[in-house]
């Protein structure tokens, strides 16, 4: 019987993974952060493809150069120094990028949409396995199918497996840390060498994956210390638990010393605690949370009703539960994390609250379990979970697919012998269009907020000697102003719009023009 249960769970996990993989195959374009992930995991010099020369002027990049930039060359395999320095230059720790580095070896070091997917899908599967262990530890084994379905097939989870950043791996380490803490609690706070070692590995790798891990770990750690005092645990146990975490923190910092600068002085650290418009940002995150679990974000009353029901169920679970600390440990750190994430992030995006999704799933399923008293309540809960996720699967779609970008790639293939001029207003978003730049003969990247870069483009002899070229301009920029400057200051008098980019932030918003004389 035990063997058949394992087979059924394996089939369920495989089915969930197949659904996610089917969406991954539909992914066409990339977020600029995804482009940076690919480059910084394999490039020895810098993850950001610099678009200017030593004088600050735009420089031509051949398609071979761009391709090499996101390709892991044989001489850079296992170049851990470069991985370390790339992330020291950026504002993230290096473990996730190291995993992507290894994953790229499966594809000969080439740039593909599956390099990061391998890392994310493995982290996802491992998180499911840990959730299974959590429910077994709580003697709620019959709730495993419902929880795996509700969490694994939610739009939020699918989106984060597809999104080629570190948030799925972060979520795995948060869930693993929770599970190990739960085991310590269930074992009357006893700590042996194996427990301390495993908890240490999880804590350090979680921190070296994404600094936000520390927020979750801190909340769980504080609750455990409080509970130890409430239960009048042995003072030696409390001291060992506390000192172990101090050592974990010191080791994490020593392994990646640049984290001090990142956390204290970067735009991703504690300086973000000064961000304003808190309640507006809070509501944006609530909408992301609602989207994650199949709730239509266009209907505010529906979101509010769903939240009232959700927290009502949690309160009921707390009242009915004989182990109230487990209810607190499952829910309160997520609430704390959510509140801090709202304050700490410059952009309100689903990725930053991804670690809350497995705990919201656990809380929802366990709350329903406390509510129902029917004999076959587990089957009913599984049906409810399945209905909710199917609503999402049929009425919504995962984020970060960028399917409209296919048209840009088709235009690039049709004009591969032409030069490509990419116009935007910053120093980073060009990483989103790397797939196009790998097709066109050569690319000139122009920042309208740069050092007279637009004027440099207009006077560039190499460009002006062309009979025609493809021009890409971000659709939020004043396109007409740039087009008029081209007509007025160059021999290129014929400009035809061949593609109008979508305005959604989850698509590649570039307008394409055929510019000719």
Task: Outline where the language-model segments fall.
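Membrane-embedded, lumen/periplasm-facing catalytic core of multi-pass transferases
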Residues: 388-453
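Perimembrane helix-loop-helix junctions
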Residues: 180-194, 215-250
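Membrane-interface alpha helices of multi-pass inner-membrane proteins
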Residues: 193-211, 247
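Hydrophobic/aromatic-rich transmembrane helices and adjacent perimembrane loops
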Residues: 170, 215, 328-333, 344-375
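Specific aromatic-rich, kink-prone transmembrane helix
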Residues: 102, 130, 153, 168-187, ...
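Signature aromatic-anchored transmembrane alpha helix within multi-pass, membrane-resident enzymes
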Residues: 9-14, 201, 362, 368-395, ...
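Transmembrane-helix motifs of polytopic, lipid-linked glycan transferases
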Residues: 115-138, 176, 312-317
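Interfacial juxtamembrane loops and adjacent helix segments
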Residues: 42-92, 104-109, 113
């Amino acid at each position: 019987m035990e063997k058949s249960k394992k087979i059924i769970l394996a089939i369920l996990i495989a089915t969930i993974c197949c659904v996610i993989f089917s969406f991954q195959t539909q992914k066409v374009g990339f977020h600029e952060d995804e482009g940076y992930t690919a480059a910084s995991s394999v490039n020895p010099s810098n993850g950001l493809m610099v678009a200017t020369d030593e004088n600050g002027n735009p420089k031509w990049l051949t398609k071979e150069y761009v391709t090499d930039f996101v390709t892991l060359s044989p001489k850079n395999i296992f170049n851990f120094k470069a991985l370390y320095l790339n992330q020291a230059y950026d504002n993230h720790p290096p473990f996730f990028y190291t995993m992507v580095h290894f994953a790229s070896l499966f594809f000969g070091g080439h740039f593909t949409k599956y390099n990061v997917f391998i890392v994310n899908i493995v982290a996802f599967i491992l998180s499911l396995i840990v959730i299974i262990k959590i429910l077994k530890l709580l003697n709620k084994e019959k709730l495993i199918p419902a929880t795996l379905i509700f969490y694994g097939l939610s739009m939020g989870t699918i989106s984060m497996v597809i999104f080629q950043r570190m948030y799925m791996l972060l979520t795995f380490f948060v869930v693993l840390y929770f599970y190990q803490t739960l085991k310590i609690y269930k074992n009357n706070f006893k700590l042996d060498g194996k427990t301390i070692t495993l908890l240490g590995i999880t804590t350090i790798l979680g921190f070296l994956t994404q600094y936000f891990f520390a927020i979750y770990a801190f909340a769980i750690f504080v609750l455990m210390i409080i509970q130890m005092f409430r239960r009048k645990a042995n003072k030696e146990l409390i001291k060992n638990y506390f000192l172990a975490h101090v050592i974990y923190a010191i080791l994490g910092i020593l392994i990646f010393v640049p984290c001090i600068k990142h956390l204290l002085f970067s735009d991703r650290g504690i300086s973000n605690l000064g961000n304003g418009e808190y309640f507006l940002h809070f509501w944006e995150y609530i909408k992301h949370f609602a989207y994650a679990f199949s709730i239509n974000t266009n209907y505010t009353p529906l979101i509010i009703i769903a939240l009232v029901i959700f927290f009502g169920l949690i309160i009921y679970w707390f009242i009915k539960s004989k182990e109230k600390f487990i209810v607190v440990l499952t829910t309160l750190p997520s609430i704390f994390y959510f509140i801090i994430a709202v304050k700490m992030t410059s952009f309100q995006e689903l990725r930053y609250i991804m670690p809350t999704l497995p705990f919201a799933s656990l809380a929802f399923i366990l709350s329903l379990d406390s509510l129902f008293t029917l004999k076959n309540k587990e089957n009913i809960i599984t049906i409810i979970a399945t209905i909710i996720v199917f609503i999402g699967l049929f009425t919504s779609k995962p984020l970060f697919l960028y399917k409209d970008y296919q048209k840009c790639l088709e235009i690039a293939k049709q004009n591969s012998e032409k030069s490509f001029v990419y116009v935007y207003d910053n120093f980073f978003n060009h990483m989103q269009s790397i797939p196009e730049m790998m097709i066109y003969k050569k690319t000139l990247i122009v920042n309208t907020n740069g050092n007279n870069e637009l004027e440099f483009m207009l006077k560039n002899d190499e460009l002006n000697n062309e009979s025609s070229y493809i021009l890409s301009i971000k659709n939020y920029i004043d396109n007409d102003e740039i087009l008029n400057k081209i007509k007025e200051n160059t021999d290129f008098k014929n400009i035809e719009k061949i593609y109008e980019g979508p305005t959604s932030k989850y698509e590649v918003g570039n307008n394409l023009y055929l510019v000719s004389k």
